[in-house]
Amino acid sequence: SLTGLFNVRILQYSVTTALRSAQRRSEPVTAIYIDVNDFKQINDTQGHQRGDEILRIVGSAIKDAARVEDSCIRYGGDEFCIILVNCREEQAKDLFVDRLIRRIKEKLVDVTISIGVAQTGPNEYVDASALIRLADERMYIAKQAHKNAGQTSST
């Protein structure tokens, strides 16, 4: 694939598996939802080759930021998702959100991203769709508030 990440067909399986495993061990599951801001405009004005290059760089930055046990997925178009097991929301923000924004800024000075973070509690049951939807909603809050930002429940 273009980005070297799993595609959306793997997402539901990854989240469901992570939730089941985490529930047995009383660990949290965190979803990070990432969107490349103004991607359509970039594609339309700078061309699809530039758009593909941006997607490859973002995919690479996501893989570099993730741990071995994390699932990195290209959700579609310019949207990505990382599923983290046993990673608290604050830790996800410090380790992933800030690092990812910084890495993308270093490689793509003219591109910004918006990130949403959602987490289940250690003993809380949430289905996969609800967790992803919440991370997506928080990504839109980050996008409206300030581009190149992340939104967690505590921010």
Please annotate each region the language model reported.
Residues 48, 97-101, 105, 120-155:
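Catalytic-core segments of nucleotide cyclases and related cyclic-nucleotide turnover enzymes
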